[in-house]
Swiss-Prot record:
Pfam families: 2-Hacid_dh_C. The gene is ghrA. GO terms for cellular component: cytoplasm. CDD domains: GDH_like_2. It catalyses: glycolate + NADP(+) = glyoxylate + NADPH + H(+); (R)-glycerate + NAD(+) = 3-hydroxypyruvate + NADH + H(+); (R)-glycerate + NADP(+) = 3-hydroxypyruvate + NADPH + H(+). Its EC number is 1.1.1.79, 1.1.1.81. Belongs to the D-isomer specific 2-hydroxyacid dehydrogenase family. GhrA subfamily. The lineage of its organism: Bacteria, Pseudomonadati, Pseudomonadota, Gammaproteobacteria, Enterobacterales. The active site is at 227, 275 (proton donor). InterPro entries: D-isomer_DH_NAD-bd, GhrA_Enterobacterales, NAD(P)-bd_dom_sf. This is Glyoxylate/hydroxypyruvate reductase A.
Length: 312
């Protein structure tokens, strides 16, 4: 079994060594320009077109949970990968726990009004504030995939009312499920904290705009953990300035790194992190990839395959 690996920043030697330990019968090599030798599987992130074009691969693994970048390249270069070759994304591989940590910590930060207390500290004001109740602090999750399910599971322990919005109906215990555009308004109307975990598709680009934000309760919060292109940044800032939104926490942006001239840097009710909410953890990724390749070789059912038409 031949496996090729390409990632512009990862330590290729470590990955090659770890994969060969996990798959003793495999020969793994870092792909370099000019390497046209046969391969059965490819592990990639932002691969050059020539790496995959013309290869008779059994499968390709994208080294991340999001596949919008590679799908965009495939759409621009259909010759890059035959439509019959399955494409897999990393399923969880430690990202679920990271998303749980991030989402729970931020929801609790807002629920306990730590942002308000920080603002009072900056004014040297000692002023206890009225508490929020859990009943009025409903959390709505847009996107009900693997990571959305993990976030909902972690928030349940804290007793917040939970709801999710997705393409298909979910039957998660303790979570109200809303489906499609026809149920979006009902989902938003009672959502105090909106958590975005949607995939990046043509249908979801720009979805968090003034029309959507206007349907949230006054004083709502937005937590974006998915993709920057989901948010119309000017609309978000307008909602913050008007008081419609009380705060926003952003991990992703339409342009990364975020330009220094962006007003998001200076807005007092915007907090941000540099796209670190959930990063690929190599050991967990190796475990998932080696397990999935073994299942594929045995003809067993697998999970994590990308539906190219849907975009996730």
């Amino acid at each position: 079994m031949e496996i090729i690996f390409y990632h512009p920043t990862f330590n290729a030697a470590w990955w090659v060594n770890a994969l060969e330990k996990a798959l003793p019968h495999a020969r793994v090599r870092e792909w370099k320009v000019g390497d046209n030798n046969p391969a059965d599987y490819a592990l990639v992130w932002q691969p050059p077109v020539e790496m995959l074009a013309g290869r008779r691969l059994k499968a390709v693994f994208a080294l991340g949970a999001g596949v919008d970048a590679i799908l965009s390249k495939l759409n621009a270069h259909p010759e890059m990968l035959d439509a019959s070759i399955p494409l897999f994304r990393l399923e969880d591989t430690g990202m679920g726990l990271q998303m749980q940590e991030y989402a729970v910590s931020q929801v609790l930060h807002w629920f306990r009004r730590f942002d308000d207390y920080q603002a009072l500290k900056n004014q040297a004001l000692w002023k206890p504030l009225p508490e929020y109740t859990r009943e009025e602090f409903s959390v709505g999750i847009m996107g009900a995939g693997v990571l959305g399910a993990k976030v909902a599971e972690s928030l349940q322990a804290w007793g917040f009312p939970l709801r999710c919005w997705s393409r298909s109906r979910k039957s998660w215990p303790g979570v109200e499920s809303y489906v499609g555009r026809e149920e979006l308004r009902a989902f938003l109307n009672q959502t105090r904290v909106l958590i975005n975990l949607l995939p990046n598709t043509a249908q979801t680009v720009g979805i968090i705009n003034s029309e959507l934000l206007d349907q949230l309760p006054d004083g709502a919060y937005v937590l974006n953990l998915a993709r920057g292109v989901h948010v119309q940044e000017a609309d978000l800032l307008a909602a913050l300035d008007s008081g419609k939104l009380k705060g926003a926490m952003l991990d992703v942006f339409s342009q990364e790194p975020l330009p220094q001239e962006s007003p998001l840097w200076r807005h007092p009710r915007v907090a941000m992190t540099p796209h670190i909410a959930a990063v690929t953890r190599p050991a967990e990724a190796i475990d998932y990839i080696s397990r999935t390749i073994t299942q594929l070789e045995k003809g067993e059912p697998v999970t994590g395959q990308v539906d190219r038409a849907r975009g996730y």
